[in-house]
Amino acid sequence: NLLTLNELEFGNEVVTMERFDLASMIHNMLRSMQVLFEQKDVKLVYDVQEPVYAWANEFKMEQVLNNYISNALNHVDGEKIIKITIQRQDGHVRAGVFNTGKPIPEEDVGRIWDKFYKVDKARTREYGGSGVGLSIVKAIMESMHQQYGVINYDNGVEFWFELDDKNEA
């Protein structure tokens, strides 16, 4: 993970962009992670059926989604729901990973993208988080000049990103 982060931060890697089906990629990832959802007794909500094409590096976007979903699994609480959404809007495809649980404290929201930053160190020790996942997301999304972020809700947190829409008009 650190090697990946260093390569991205120092721009040593050429990012190859391609048209790919984001909906199918997410579906396949979730299928391969199914046992993790079952172990934590998490209700997964993802009901995108049709292809949704985006323009990005598919391998890098798998890393982004893997980090978002892993974070959701590590922090899900309360109703134990993880909901993944895809929306097309204004020439972009926006994907979100929401988990029920405690919102991120406002004073920490701006720092969660920093390398090695951990909001709850005691909780992070429980699952062995290194604090580089979201900084990798930041580096990947910035290398592709795309938007990403986090939204706090009363009942949880949503991490999101946007990619260029490559669906037929």
At which residue positions do the language-model features occur?
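Conserved catalytic submotifs in the C-terminal HATPase_c
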Residues: 16-20, 38, 43-53
